[in-house]
Amino acid sequence: MTIITPITNDPTTALLRLMAWLSPVFPVGSFSYSHGLERAVHDGLVVDAAGLQDWLQWLVRRGSGWNDAVLCAESWRCTMKGEDLHEIAELAEALAGSRERHMETMLQGGAFLAAARSWPCEIFDRLPPDCAYPVAVGAVAGGHGVPLAQALAAFLQAFCINLLQASIRLSVTGQSGVTAIMAALEPVLGETAARAALSSMEDLGSATFIADIMAMKHETQHSRLFRS
């Protein structure tokens, strides 16, 4: 029996779906990725809560977090307009700057689509079988009528929370430090989500070169906790 999940115009339903899809327990395997943070800690570039907060805010504002938010927004818009999603999916995959970043976004994207099928939607038939994570999230959010700004804010927060969880395992900070950083990042997440909601493909671009290099160097790190 096929269960059809209706497109929502109810803000509470939209919130519940975002909280489910972007929860740390949603089965995308996010806990196994550090996005290069493990190497940054290893090399002494991130050693405390202040450095971690700075690292995260620039990833969100000017780094891979920003690019992913732009891709997520474009995927959402293509979905709402009924446009083809293959081109944006190919671009998102091509923008992965290293082998482990590529693995991180593609495996999470595939796992997200598989798990999100518990909320049936026609968008799954329009997506390529291999899909980068931000494109998958944007398309599913758009397919269910979840407002763009809220989807982007939740997506960016989930990105940061995953790295904050990694920071605890890497002994950069503890739970009290993580909650303080979460609170401090709220304005950054809100402002970046608002910018991304108004973005176009011309706004793609990042300037967090050290973070990108750390992601590359992690590929040759022998002792590790994370896959990226």
UniProtKB/Swiss-Prot annotation:
Write the record's keywords in alphabetical order, separated by commas.
Answer: Chaperone, Cytoplasm, Nickel insertion
Q: Name one GO molecular function term.
A: nickel cation binding
Species annotation:
Brucella melitensis biotype 1 (strain ATCC 23456 / CCUG 17765 / NCTC 10094 / 16M)
The protein's location, in the record's own words, is: Cytoplasm
Role this protein plays: Required for maturation of urease via the functional incorporation of the urease nickel metallocenter.
Short name of any one Pfam family annotated for the protein: UreF
Q: What is this protein called?
A: Urease accessory protein UreF 2
Q: Which InterPro entries match?
A: UreF, UreF_sf
Predominant location: cytoplasm
Q: How does it assemble?
A: UreD, UreF and UreG form a complex that acts as a GTP-hydrolysis-dependent molecular chaperone, activating the urease apoprotein by helping to assemble the nickel containing metallocenter of UreC. The UreE protein probably delivers the nickel.
UniProt lists the family membership as follows: Belongs to the UreF family.
Tell me which GO cellular component terms the UniProt record holds: cytoplasm
Disulphide bond pairs: none
| PANTHER family, A to Z | UREASE ACCESSORY PROTEIN F
